[in-house]
């Protein structure tokens, strides 16, 4: 029977989705399930790994049954996942020994501070391209081994396995056939040497993490295992693609040439610039990471993460009650010709790239008696664009490549005002794709390439479709004046920090 589809699992921070794509890269069907967020203490975020599995299984069942999809028509399965989130489980029983510690969680902060105080930042930066931060997986693993009785000894005996969410899903979908991850996820653990392309013994020793726990690292497009027959009505499907969510979006946006950039406007913003075979070391507070591994070689990227983007609109809606629906923000923003000199620096949980300051908090500047709700909302949307420019200016400086366009995805960029203002403040066109599910599409493309469903990246690039192109309209002098005001606001925010 000729395969018609590729299936993607998009396992995110708040929900799991299953999306079926046809050969043209169009969506045939989808299903989604949310799951619980667990907050044991302020600043800690955990998930139940078993509930994540249940949510994934439910989406697969719903998608296939509702669409009456014959599993024999599915060529392959690709997985994309929330990165850095950490699971440790029992090799024999498959049961997790602790909740998954989520990428957002700060519970391993003290371990990070110890590593910094011992002077290990330069080593970690050189080997991994990352900063010492609780964001990444390594200190989360150390925390679990420290806080679950007997875990260190069991790990040393080879009884425990570690994985990011992709590894956890492949292990369970395959019935324990494969304990694997891909280069893009391994590069986010703080344990992987992005130059030698292997787990780094010095970093493992630094945190006393046994190598026996770690998954095998493979290309992002490869047949790792097959699904257990019971998942697809006794029809095993090759699990053939893995990529962390932001790298998958870069692939789904067909950013295959050095210098191409995508920005995902979600709860936060995540920008990746493809840098090809070169691992560019940042001088400006960005992360050097692996984009993907294909055909036995890896390609690299520069990454900048903004902690608060679309969530500022949720704050306007839920916290301040300024709007009833997120979509109302656009209508309010265009009621005024500008923000009236108001700047919002949404450092609610600190500032990410390129500042990396967790000790600052949000601030607002330029308020007058004439400031009203529309100015406030407009300033909140403009803050996303200013933060994006901060990161993209750093990327261009690091890579020595001038930005010619920005490919944008994510829910927030459906806001036409934001898209237009972003193009204005960057001075380059913003391209919004026809298909916004670029993360899942990237995972599908990687899986499809592994089994020959798609033949090449050139074929994939030709399928990329444009919804709308936003050209910059603002005069250069006005653009730079507005951005200078933003820089002043950030400088003042950095000066007013918390202990």
Curated annotation (Swiss-Prot):
Any one of the GO CC terms: cytosol
Alphabetized GO MF terms: ATP binding; glycerol kinase activity
Keywords: ATP-binding, Glycerol metabolism, Kinase, Nucleotide-binding, Transferase
Positions with a binding annotation for ADP: 13, 17, 267, 310, 411, 415
Entry EC number(s): 2.7.1.30
Amino acids binding ATP: 13-15, 267, 310, 314, 411
GO BP term, pick one: glycerol catabolic process
UniProt-annotated binding residues for glycerol: 83-84, 135, 245-246
Keyword ATP-binding: yes
Residues that bind sn-glycerol 3-phosphate: 13, 83-84, 135, 245
InterPro entries to which the protein is assigned, alphabetical: ATPase_NBD, Carb_kinase_FGGY, Carb_kinase_FGGY_CS, FGGY_C, FGGY_N, Glycerol_kin
Catalyzed reactions per annotation: glycerol + ATP = sn-glycerol 3-phosphate + ADP + H(+)
UniProt entry tagged with the keyword Disulfide bond: no
Recorded family membership: Belongs to the FGGY kinase family.
Biological function: Key enzyme in the regulation of glycerol uptake and metabolism. Catalyzes the phosphorylation of glycerol to yield sn-glycerol 3-phosphate.
Name of this protein: Glycerol kinase
Organism (species): Stenotrophomonas maltophilia (strain R551-3)
